[in-house]
């Protein structure tokens, strides 16, 4: 499928680019899986690095965004029971979605 092949090509270019960038890890396929790379994302060192990355990229015309807003941080759910969400918070404070367009020739 051309669509998925194009998405995977974009991801491969990101993987190559970010492999030599310190403190930034590009999300890649897990072993024995084949991702369609619907969204591309990077993991940064901490919340401060995430904010810096978002500011720098968006200020320079590259549209990036945090991976998600946690539901327990939304006013209507802030009093709902949860287990502390340690792992979820770790990712929310570090992951940034980067442009994931399709380029079909």
Model-derived regions, located:
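PLP-dependent aminotransferase class I/II
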Residues: 1-105
């Amino acid at each position: 499928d051309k669509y998925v092949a194009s998405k995977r090509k974009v991801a491969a270019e990101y993987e190559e680019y970010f492999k030599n960038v310190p403190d930034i890890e590009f999300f890649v396929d897990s072993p024995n899986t084949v991702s369609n790379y619907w969204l591309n994302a990077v993991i940064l060192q901490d919340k401060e690095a995430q904010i810096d990355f978002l500011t720098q990229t968006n200020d320079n015309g590259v549209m990036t965004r945090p991976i998600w807003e946690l539901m327990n941080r939304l006013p209507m759910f802030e009093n709902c029971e949860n287990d502390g969400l340690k792992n979820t918070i770790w990712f929310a404070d570090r992951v940034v979605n980067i442009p994931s367009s399709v380029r079909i020739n």
